[in-house]
């Protein structure tokens, strides 16, 4: 995170590799059994450049350099894998998870792979229309893999930098056209009120510099297109399921419909694979953040040699967006993010043991629940194997009924005594879980 500038200089009390949220996310991944690498990248751009095209070029170069550095990091781990595998990684399951600016890096990493994509008209200097000049010159800055250019130190040449999924926290992409069929699966969490990373599509602006670049797409529009291209088809069983995080995301998406995001666009119908974090704060962007004002002033004055007021200003700017910032709030949003991301990572990388969408569809079609709609009882039948566990969840994710230690192909649940509404019935068969909707009336 950090808007591609160093902490304090970016106007924020965050932007370090050891920020609370960043470290907590890495620790949470590690506790789940993942190898977590907290990767830094080159920073710096010029928001005070005189023209909008120069500001856009400066910011996009910063994103571009960060993508190059991240690809170099992936190649580093693949190189190590071939030479002892110090960290015990699985090269068939590499996930890029980015927070704030890191979300931009993750989405750009997965989508930028053609020269034409960085030579769109908005990335050209058109001061002389007869002689357009590319603002991102690969002869100077190198290609998107970090090879060539004047400033790159090429590393781990020959190793793949392929990844298998992208998770974004409040990120966006430079242009929606970058996203194409065949790109890796992706999911996101995002505040519709984010004033920098627009939730739908809009301009990126900084108060002191005005518009930086135009038509940047945030998580809502990115996931809408990724879903429509079929890139996220592998996640369909998760979205059809009844885990509490998916249900919470679906409820939040329904609540977000009709909202106006910071760019002035009215949010449309709910979209799978994005969890909108809607709070009571009108400019909320990073509800997972947590910082200490005293430490912020110390970093500004002692570490960076700036006036103490710079640290105070950074704290006040951030607290204006997140006035109820607290450990409880930060941890709650980190938990929601991890719960939402990890379920999708497991599915996208086949950690759940399902070999294909066809296999999952076959298992799902083998389960019958009737009558549906129901009243006081339902029968669950299986054609594929013995039912081990049945769980029923309300639309808010509350577990309302469980039957465990089962061993039958047909189970009757009676005396439900449930309120009218939509419920999710999760059936476990030989360690595999399928969720179906049940209506109680």
Which sequence ranges carry the predicted segments?
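Conserved alpha/beta-hydrolase
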Residues: 33-46
């Amino acid at each position: 995170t950090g808007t591609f500038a160093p902490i304090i200089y970016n106007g924020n009390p965050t932007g370090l590799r050891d920020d609370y949220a960043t470290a907590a996310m890495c620790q949470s991944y590690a506790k789940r059994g993942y190898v977590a690498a907290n990767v830094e990248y080159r920073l710096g751009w010029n928001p005070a450049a005189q023209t909008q095209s120069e500001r856009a070029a400066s910011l996009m170069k910063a994103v571009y350099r960060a993508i190059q550095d991240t690809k170099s990091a992936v190649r580093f781990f693949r190189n190590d894998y071939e030479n002892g595998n110090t960290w015990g990684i699985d090269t068939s399951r590499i996930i890029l998870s980015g927070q704030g600016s890191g979300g931009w890096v993750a989405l750009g990493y997965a989508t930028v792979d053609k020269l034409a994509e960085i030579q769109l008209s908005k990335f050209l200097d058109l001061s002389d229309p007869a002689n357009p000049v590319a603002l991102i010159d690969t002869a100077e800055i190198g290609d998107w893999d970090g090879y060539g250019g004047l400033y790159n130190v090429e590393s781990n040449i020959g190793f793949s930098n392929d990844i298998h999924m992208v998770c974004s926290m409040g990120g966006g992409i430079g242009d929606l056209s970058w996203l194409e069929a065949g790109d890796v699966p992706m999911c996101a969490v995002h505040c519709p009120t984010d004033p920098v990373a627009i939730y739908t599509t809009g301009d990126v602006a900084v108060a002191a510099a005005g518009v930086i670049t135009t038509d940047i797409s945030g998580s809502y529009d990115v996931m809408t297109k990724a879903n429509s291209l079929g890139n996220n088809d592998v996640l369909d069983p998760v979205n059809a399921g009844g885990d509490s995080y998916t249900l919470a995301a679906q409820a939040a998406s329904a609540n977000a419909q009709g909202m106006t995001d910071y760019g002035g666009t009215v949010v449309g119908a709910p979209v799978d694979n994005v969890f909108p974090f809607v709070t009571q704060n009108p400019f909320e962007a990073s509800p997972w953040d947590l910082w200490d004002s005293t430490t912020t002033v110390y970093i500004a004055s002692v570490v960076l040699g700036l006036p103490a007021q710079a640290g105070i200003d950074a704290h006040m700017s951030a607290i204006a967006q997140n006035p109820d910032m607290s450990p409880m709030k930060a941890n709650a949003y980190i938990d929601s993010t991890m719960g939402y991301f990890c379920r999708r990572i497991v599915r996208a990388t086949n950690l759940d043991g399902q070999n294909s969408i066809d296999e999952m569809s076959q298992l799902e079609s083998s389960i019958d629940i009737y009558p549906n709609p129901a009243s006081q009882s339902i029968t669950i039948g299986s054609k594929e194997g013995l039912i081990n566990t049945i769980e029923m969840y309300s639309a808010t994710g509350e577990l309302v009924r469980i039957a465990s230690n089962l061993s039958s192909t047909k189970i009757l649940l009676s005396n439900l005594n449930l309120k009218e509404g939509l419920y999710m019935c999760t059936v476990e068969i030989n360690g595999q879980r399928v969720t179906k909707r049940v209506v109680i009336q």
